[in-house]
Amino acid sequence: MAAALRLTPHMRQAYPVVAAPSVARLSTLDASKLTIETTTQPRERVEKTKLVFGHTFSDHMLKCKWDVNEGWAAPTISPYANLSLAPSSIVLHYAIECFEGMKAFRGDDDRIRLFRPNLNMDRLHRSSVRLALPDFDQDELLKCITELVIKDKDWIPAGRGYSLYLRPTHIGTAEYLGVGKSSSSLLFCINSPSGAYYSTGFKPVSLLADPAYVRAWPGGVGNTKGGCNYAPSIYPQSQAQAQGCQQVLWLFGEDHEVTEVGTMNLFMYWKNEQGEDELITPPLDGTILPGVTRQSIVDMARGWNEFKVSERKFNMGQVSRALKEGRVYEMFGAGTAATVCPIGQIKYLGEDLNVPLALGNSGELTNRIWTDIFDIQYGAVEHEWAPVIA
């Protein structure tokens, strides 16, 4: 087994877990019980320059089953294959499902690294608890995922921008109709080799900011990575594309508070009303997904100590006014898939608001963040955020 990766302290669950009366005797998720079955029919490889995100999958997958009476069964790594689910499986009817998005990188030194995997494990744990899926040991799950990555490490393409995208997923599998806690679940992980998101350089996106559509609201599940948050975004996304925009800028409330962009967190670098240079992003108030890239940008920028870094609310009125007054330096989205994504224009209430792009296709800060994160992910800079696993 690979060396254990330690996790930082995490929040205790705030919701009850489905359990039999003999809770203490239920089996916990245990990576030492992991068994590995090697495929005898390797999957077809795709030339890395022809990879389409999320369309190609590696040879193996991880599966961890849970049952209310027994707890967690021994985890397995086996050949990638279809799942067998009953038509009555609760996940198919009530969206009792959550997932993660994380990556493994082949570094400039040919060693394999993850990027802040403890944050992904913590978020998956919190998403699971919020959806009344069973508790699990984050350290043990990370050990299992690490073994899966090592098993399929030959699927990780070399080169900056390339990676193996990891998709841990937790679903309720109980076979009955009725809204309630699932008496069984499946936690699995599949891997997809990914090409460079920007194969020919940055491509700024245009956004549709339409207050008619709301992504999340107080007391909801906007801070979880549940599939229930993504399906309702597809129609507004199609409306944005019909108006020539690539993404939706999600707004909330009567004052059109800015929240997220597409499936990414949002940042704005500007001169605020007090005349200060400030990097600002919406706060984690329960409506915002706590992105790993988001947290990394906040941590890095605060470490530079070159300008003010704030996690606070702001609205489209402030953005529009600042753009018209020339106080916005740049805006960008941040997420696992793209790392950072420059914003070039916002369509809002009949106006086309142009966002500065100092370097032609991105802002200077956007480019700096992208470079610094890549240097960590690919090992050019040794950092605790990028543990070497192989």
From Swiss-Prot:
Keywords annotated in UniProt: Amino-acid biosynthesis, Aminotransferase, Branched-chain amino acid biosynthesis, Pyridoxal phosphate, Transferase
Catalyzed reactions per annotation: L-leucine + 2-oxoglutarate = 4-methyl-2-oxopentanoate + L-glutamate; L-isoleucine + 2-oxoglutarate = (S)-3-methyl-2-oxopentanoate + L-glutamate; L-valine + 2-oxoglutarate = 3-methyl-2-oxobutanoate + L-glutamate
GO MF entry, a single one: L-leucine-2-oxoglutarate transaminase activity
Named cofactor requirement(s): pyridoxal 5'-phosphate
CDD domains reported for this sequence: BCAT_beta_family (cd01557)
Record flagged with keyword Phosphoprotein: no
Residues with PTM N6-(pyridoxal phosphate)lysine: K225
EC top class, as a word: transferase
Family membership noted in the UniProt record: Belongs to the class-IV pyridoxal-phosphate-dependent aminotransferase family.
PANTHER family: BRANCHED-CHAIN-AMINO-ACID AMINOTRANSFERASE, SUBGROUP IIII AMINOTRANSFERASE
Protein name: Branched-chain-amino-acid aminotransferase
Organism: Monosiga brevicollis (Choanoflagellate)
